[in-house]
Amino acid sequence: MANNKSSKKRVEIAERNRLQNKAYKSSMRTLMKRCFSACEAYNATPGDEAKTSVQASMNAAFSKIDKAVKRGVLHRNAGAHQKARLSVAVKKAIDPAPASAS
């Protein structure tokens, strides 16, 4: 347990930051899940409206990930990893690979 005033304050600040980071990560994960579900919806029923939904959800998730990296909630490489996951899912949904001729 903290013994002096400054260490008690650091404990309080660390707890506050932990809760803020937790909330930020949670909202980031939610936006990522929305993007993945939008990709699945586009695969089920392709159309212009579904495509714009995929693009909008991807942009929102990218923005949130970039802000998390900027705030220090997420490491730069972890942010890049999550953005790559989203990009692959969106690319696979919008531009599916053509079937091989073999």
Swiss-Prot record:
GO terms for cellular component: cytosol; small ribosomal subunit. InterPro entries: Ribosomal_bS20, Ribosomal_bS20_sf. One of its GO terms (biological process) is translation. The keyword Ribonucleoprotein applies. One of its GO terms (molecular function) is small ribosomal subunit rRNA binding. Keywords: Ribonucleoprotein, Ribosomal protein, RNA-binding, rRNA-binding. It holds the Pfam family Ribosomal_S20p. Gene3D superfamilies: Ribosomal protein S20 (1.20.58.110). Belongs to the bacterial ribosomal protein bS20 family. Binds directly to 16S ribosomal RNA. This is Small ribosomal subunit protein bS20. The gene is rpsT.
